[in-house]
């Protein structure tokens, strides 16, 4: 009786379960079909979208309402790959679609996306969607936030977007959009002037052109930010812009605007940021004393009329940053200019300012940087206990031998080494970082980009500390699972003055975030819930792919029976493996000695990663003892430098050969598989103009790469005079050609092809014959690798050499190497680093160049060594043309490296030299002893050649 009652109770519970399930389950049929289409297209969702009922079992990233209709899809930073299926248009109740940070989502947007008429939030930021923005997007009349930035959209802005009357956030920056800004015709055609509720026009870094329509702005608009920077707008600034009373940030810099700067801007009394640099404005700078809230004023690089330093600037009481570079200012600088209480940065370089510079006694206590290089200043009256970094190079005062060693004649603009990462003694594994308590965890990382900060320079770190405190206050108040935050590698894009902060967000309570937690953090940035401190301006945050989710969600669905079964099965399997292992070990010992003789990788110590010995091309495996002996136990005397990867040591083998050993530090150690892949790749690279890998060491928990030793150091050492090498014009041409051949080989003849990703003068070495050799593949990527289109938000490469497109796409390609090489070519001309004392060599050459004059009128920029030792600079103009083609802002307009090599070879012929006298063409110089067939990986050690 008791048994039957238990069975009856069990049946009752089953029945009750299905009754409850029937109430709270069964997703709407059409919605399920649409989600299934997404799942089929984005196969990475197959693990988290398992059940047959998305609403009933809460598929990750899916939210449903009480009617089992899908109302939200939030799949940020999920490594999604593929396209956006047209079936998504059937989700008629969808209100939120957030696919932020999936850089392998591509293809055009579905033309029927306008069917999602209840959509209020659409964010596709940081993907790779292309093609035109569909006209149907104008049907999304409930939309309040639209983020299409950091994609590859082309074509024009649809006029239909003027119907989005509820839109507040409108961000289409960092795309390839072109054409004019659409405005309404007063009848049936809508336009952007109808967006009266919009607070943000973020249109920067596109190809938009034509005049900015007078009709675009009106007093009824509620705009806070107008970011039109980095486009191709022409004509004058519309007077109507002065009617937008709420405006706080205005960026019109890096366009082709002309005419007078309108005095109507003085009506924008709430304006905090005004950027008008790099245009073609003429006339005088109008009096802007009504802009009492202004933090930043930048009118640099405009052909304004000759005039004195404006006397009204001291009345801008909130001013923090003042940039009036190259606008024909003359006369003295009044001491009152430095008196605004919040003033931190003043840059008036490349003007006609004269007499003695005097900061006075009432200068701002916040002042830390004054740049008046390239003027006609005859003296400097330095205040007592002066904390200000003053730069006066290229002025008359610095021509006096008595002043040439003074700080103000040699000062350099400070770079940031600021980091708030906790310094802990222990080393964390790959992907982990120490949190505030020195526990190794997996942080959420990404780049926090300030699009218009009202502070500049890195000498005052208080701004960044306030930022960190502000973030933690936000996370704590919102009860986010965040233990701490940290910053590192803060940098400023020299093109648009965007400030890039590499941000680390550490999980609380365990070593990683789960998917829900990561989504909530990303969402806080995407919908701008987080408000940074004053003066930080508009921002975006693009997170790196997070692939180490906590499995806590999945563990809840695993039954105890399954767990027990798995444990029992594993135990039995381990016993069988142990018995088999004992037998195999006995057999292995018998052949160990012979194997060691035949295969130097028999002692490959891969730890827990079992793998075949790497396939190598004439490369030797060294033991730790061998390399320790040849470097005197890695003594400081043998330490010749280092970087992010680790230290480099000079060593001498028993046969007398000198070698360079790259010894990885703990923080940059790779897994065994990754290290194997790298040495297999490097061993197959054989070219006269590429540094040769001689061997490697994977022993005693060490990872080392052994290269041929290059005695004359780097090209940067040569240009700076550090290695005592005199580089005349012909030597520089040969160095350019040699390094170009090396890169062309990597791009086009190496198999698989390689993108270097960090081309710079420090990574071009000079041997005893001054033959250039491309070095340092620590950041290289295989072009044929799955990561060919790898997009990362962690800043790669080196500032000054970075492809401008990288700041928009976070993607490095072969054309990124071409850009870096173009910067090196200009560096060969000037002898200076690409960013020297705050000046960017690319911008300086373009600004000073006059093709109608001898040597393009660039004599002032040339390294004096060229002029003193070279005589007639044949081929100079053609060389400059090639270099400037390489540094075109858009990769599609740059040549390939093989095309660059052909041009450089023709220049050497013009000079009267044989381009192949000292080195073969890049095809012939490969010196590959194995032939192209050996480049195909077979997974076995190659048979030695007789």
UniProtKB/Swiss-Prot annotation:
The active site is at 758 (proton acceptor). Residues 919-946 are annotated as: Disordered. The chain crosses the membrane at residues 562-582. Residues 1-25 form the signal peptide. Its EC number is 2.7.11.1. Gene3D superfamilies: Phosphorylase Kinase, domain 1 (3.30.200.20), Ribonuclease Inhibitor (3.80.10.10), Transferase(Phosphotransferase) domain 1 (1.10.510.10). Residues 583-946 are cytoplasmic. Its main location: membrane. Glycans are attached at residues 246, 267, 287, 354, 362, 415, 460, 489, 514. It catalyses: L-seryl-[protein] + ATP = O-phospho-L-seryl-[protein] + ADP + H(+); L-threonyl-[protein] + ATP = O-phospho-L-threonyl-[protein] + ADP + H(+). Keywords: ATP-binding, Glycoprotein, Kinase, Leucine-rich repeat, Membrane, Nucleotide-binding, Receptor, Repeat, Serine/threonine-protein kinase, Signal, Transferase, Transmembrane, Transmembrane helix. GO terms for cellular component: membrane; plastid. It is found in: Membrane. SUPFAM superfamilies: L domain-like, Protein kinase-like (PK-like). Residues 634-908 form the Protein kinase domain. ATP binds at residues 640-648, 662. GO terms for molecular function: ATP binding; protein serine kinase activity; protein serine/threonine kinase activity. LRR repeats lie at residues 67-91, 92-116, 118-140, 141-164, 166-191, 195-219, 221-244, 245-268, 269-293, 295-314, 316-340, 342-365, 367-387, 389-407. Residues 26-561 are extracellular. InterPro entries: Kinase-like_dom_sf (IPR011009), Leu-rich_rpt (IPR001611), Leu-rich_rpt_4 (IPR025875), LRR_dom_sf (IPR032675), LRR_N_plant-typ (IPR013210), LRR_R13L4/SHOC2-like (IPR055414), Prot_kinase_dom (IPR000719), Protein_kinase_ATP_BS (IPR017441). Belongs to the protein kinase superfamily. Ser/Thr protein kinase family. This is Probable leucine-rich repeat receptor-like protein kinase At5g49770. The lineage of its organism: Eukaryota, Viridiplantae, Streptophyta, Embryophyta, Tracheophyta.
């Amino acid at each position: 009786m008791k048994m039957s009652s238990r069975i009856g109770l069990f049946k009752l519970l089953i029945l009750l379960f299905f009754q409850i399930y029937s109430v709270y389950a069964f997703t709407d049929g059409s919605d399920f079909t649409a989600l299934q289409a997404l799942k089929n297209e984005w196969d990475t969702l197959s693990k988290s979208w398992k059940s047959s009922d998305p609403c009933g079992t809460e598929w990750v990233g899916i939210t449903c309402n009480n009617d089992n209709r899908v109302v939200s899809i939030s799949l940020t930073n999920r490594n999604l790959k593929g396209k956006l299926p047209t079936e998504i248009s059937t989700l008629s109740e969808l209100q939120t679609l957030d696919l932020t940070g999936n850089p392998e989502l591509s293809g055009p947007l579905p033309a029927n996306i306008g069917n999602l008429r209840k959509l209020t939030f659409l964010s596709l930021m940081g993907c790779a969607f292309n093609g035109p923005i569909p006209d149907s997007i104008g049907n999304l009349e409930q939309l309040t936030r639209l983020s299409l930035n950091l994609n590859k959209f082309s074509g024009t802005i649809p006029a239909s977007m003027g119907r989005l009357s509820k839109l507040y956030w409108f961000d289409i920056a960092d795309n390839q959009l072109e054409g004019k800004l659409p405005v309404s015709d007063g009848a049936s055609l809508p336009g952007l002037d109808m967006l009266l509720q919009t607070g943000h026009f973020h249109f920067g870094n596109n190809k938009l052109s034509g005049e900015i329509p007078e009709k675009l702005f009106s007093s009824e608009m509620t705009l806070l930010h107008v970011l039109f920077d980095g486009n191709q707008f022409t004509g004058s600034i519309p007077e109507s812009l002065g009617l937008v009373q709420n405006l706080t940030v205005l960026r019109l810099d890096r366009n082709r605007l002309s005419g007078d700067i309108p005095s109507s801007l003085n009506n924008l009394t709430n304006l905090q940021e005004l950027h008008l640099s790099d245009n073609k404005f003429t006339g005088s700078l109008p009096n802007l004393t009504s802009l009492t809230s202004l933090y930043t004023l930048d009118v640099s690089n405009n052909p304004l009329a000759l005039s004195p330093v404006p006397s009204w600037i001291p009345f801008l009481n909130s001013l923090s940053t003042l940039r009036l570079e190259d606008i024909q200012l003359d006369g003295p600088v009044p001491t009152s200019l430095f008196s605004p209480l919040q003033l931190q940065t003043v840059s008036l370089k490349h003007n006609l300012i004269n007499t003695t510079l005097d900061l006075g006694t009432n200068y701002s206590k916040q002042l830390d940087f004054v740049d008046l290089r390239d003027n006609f200043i005859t003296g400097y009256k330095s205040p007592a206990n002066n904390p200000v970094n003053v730069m006066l190079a290229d002025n008359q005062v610095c021509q006096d031998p008595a002043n040439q060693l003074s700080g103000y004649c040699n000062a350099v603009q400070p770079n940031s080494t600021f980091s708030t990462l906790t310094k802990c003694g222990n080393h964390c594994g790959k992907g982990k970082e120490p949190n505030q308590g020195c526990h190794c965890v997996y942080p959420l990382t990404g780049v926090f980009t300030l699009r218009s900060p009202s502070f500049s320079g890195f000498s005052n770190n208080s701004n960044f500390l306030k930022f960190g405190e502000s973030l933690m206050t936000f996370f704590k108040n919102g009860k986010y699972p965040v233990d701490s935050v940290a910053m590192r590698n803060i940098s400023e894009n020299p093109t648009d003055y965007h400030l890039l902060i590499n941000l680390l967000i550490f999980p609380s309570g365990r070593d990683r975030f789960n998917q829900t937690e990561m989504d909530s953090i990303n969402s806080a940035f995407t919908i701008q819930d987080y408000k940074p401190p004053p003066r930080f301006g508009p921002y975006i945050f693009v997170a790196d792919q997070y692939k180490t989710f906590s499995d806590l969600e999945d563990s809840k669905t695993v039954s105890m029976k399954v767990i027990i079964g798995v444990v029992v099965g594993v135990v039995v399997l381990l016993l069988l493996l142990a018995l088999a292992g004992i037998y195999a070990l006995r057999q292995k010992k018998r052949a160990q000695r012979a194997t060691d003789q035949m295969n130097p990788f028999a002692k490959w110590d891969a730890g827990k990663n079992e793998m075949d010995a790497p396939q190598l091309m004439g490369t030797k495996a060294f033991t730790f003892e061998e390399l320790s002996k040849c470097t005197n136990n890695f003594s400081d005397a043998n330490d010749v430098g280092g970087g992010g990867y680790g230290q480099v040591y000079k060593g001498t083998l028993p046969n007398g050969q000198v070698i360079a050993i790259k010894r990885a530090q703990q923080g940059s150690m790779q897994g065994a598989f990754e290290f194997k892949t790298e040495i297999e790749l490097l061993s197959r690279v054989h070219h006269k103009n590429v540094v040769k890998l001689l061997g490697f060491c994977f022993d005693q928990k060490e990872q080392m790469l052994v290269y041929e030793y290059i005695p004359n150091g780097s090209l940067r050492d040569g240009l700076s005079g550090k290695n005592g090498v005199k580089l005349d014009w012909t030597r520089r041409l040969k160095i350019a050609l040699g390094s170009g051949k090396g890169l062309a080989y990597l791009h086009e003849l190496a198999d698989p092809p390689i993108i270097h990703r960090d081309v710079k003068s420090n990574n071009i070495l000079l041997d005893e014959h001054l033959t250039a050799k491309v070095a340092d593949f620590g950041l290289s990527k295989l072009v044929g690798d799955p990561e060919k289109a790898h997009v990362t938000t962690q800043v790669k490469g080196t500032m000054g050499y970075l492809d401008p497109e990288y700041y928009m796409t976070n993607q490095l390609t072969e054309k990124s190497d071409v850009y870096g090489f173009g910067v090196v070519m200009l560096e060969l001309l000037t002898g200076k680093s690409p960013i020297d004392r705050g000046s960017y060599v690319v911008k300086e050459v373009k600004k000073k160049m006059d093709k109608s004059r001898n040597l393009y009128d660039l004599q002032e920029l040339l390294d004096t060594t060229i002029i003193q030792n070279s005589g007639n600079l044949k081929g100079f103009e053609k060389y400059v043309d090639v270099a400037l083609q390489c540094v075109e802002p858009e990769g599609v307009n740059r040549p390939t490296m093989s095309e660059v090599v052909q041009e450089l070879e023709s220049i050497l012929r013009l000079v009267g030299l044989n381009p192949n006298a000292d080195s073969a063409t890049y095809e012939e110089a490969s010196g590959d002893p194995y032939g192209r067939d050996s480049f195909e990986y077979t997974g076995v050690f190659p048979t030695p050649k007789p």
